[in-house]
């Protein structure tokens, strides 16, 4: 991304620099070492996985359910969500857990609030929140796609909505953390390599975005929104470590999912050699949500692939 293109008084931000080692590792990840085999029994544990009607989110929900967790599968209203629940139940017929649908449209903050109200009317505990859902509007070259509140679609769906969802669930998270070992109640923020390649240098994402985003391509807007997820993950860790909650922004990798559905044939062809099964992304999400090797001391660290935790220089 060019560091100094200007239109009027608005300037494109300078992007951070990704090391070659980081780029290579994220494009060609090592064999995963934290898989569903390492996931412990989760009887009595409650999780929310957003965007779980397909892809990585569905795989993460399946793995949690297979270990007897109660999983709220949060996704947009429509036939895909009940179909996903039926699919997971068929794949794991002997689970002692439960799959609960939770209608969640991240393009409307009013619906986000209603989803939280429904959850808190049913539950008093939440052991893990995986903010997995996202949109990549590659066809929105003119920036016309907006949320119900009028926000640019990537900022609204990928940044503002997960922030509000998590903020409104913080009360039940902190209440649960008081009853659990420190660092075992966790929030996972699914980011991407865009944090390092497109995110604003030393900031990730700033309020300046509302002014400069029209200068950016849809793919750049997506990458910047993912930097926003990283920023929220780090800041949530700082604010709530004292309450015993761990927070991890992660890069699940380049995966075969619905995320790229708006990409053209050439775009998809170029990505094909570096796309991995959604299961791999779910492994990273579960590593961040459950691995005993991570503690409160690691909270806020950037997790990419399995057993790789570090702090990037954005």
Swiss-Prot record:
Pathway info: Mycotoxin biosynthesis
Residue numbers spanned by region Disordered: 1-27
InterPro entries named among the record's database cross-references: NAD(P)-bd_dom_sf, SDR_fam
Taxonomic superkingdom: Eukaryota
EC number per UniProt: 1.1.1.-
Biased composition (Polar residues): 1-10
GO MF entry, a single one: oxidoreductase activity
Keyword Mitochondrion: no
Keyword terms of this UniProt record: NADP, Oxidoreductase
Catalytic activity: dehydroprobetaenone I + AH2 = probetaenone I + A; betaenone C + AH2 = betaenone B + A
Function: Short-chain dehydrogenase/reductase; part of the gene cluster that mediates the biosynthesis of the phytotoxin stemphyloxin II. The first step of the pathway is the synthesis of dehydroprobetaenone I by the polyketide synthase sthA and the enoyl reductase sthE via condensation of one acetyl-CoA starter unit with 7 malonyl-CoA units and 5 methylations. The C-terminal reductase (R) domain of sthA catalyzes the reductive release of the polyketide chain. Because sthA lacks a designated enoylreductase (ER) domain, the required activity is provided the enoyl reductase sthE.
Family that this chain belongs to: Belongs to the short-chain dehydrogenases/reductases (SDR) family.
Name of the protein in its database record: Short-chain dehydrogenase/reductase sthC
Organism the protein comes from: Phaeosphaeria nodorum (strain SN15 / ATCC MYA-4574 / FGSC 10173) (Glume blotch fungus)
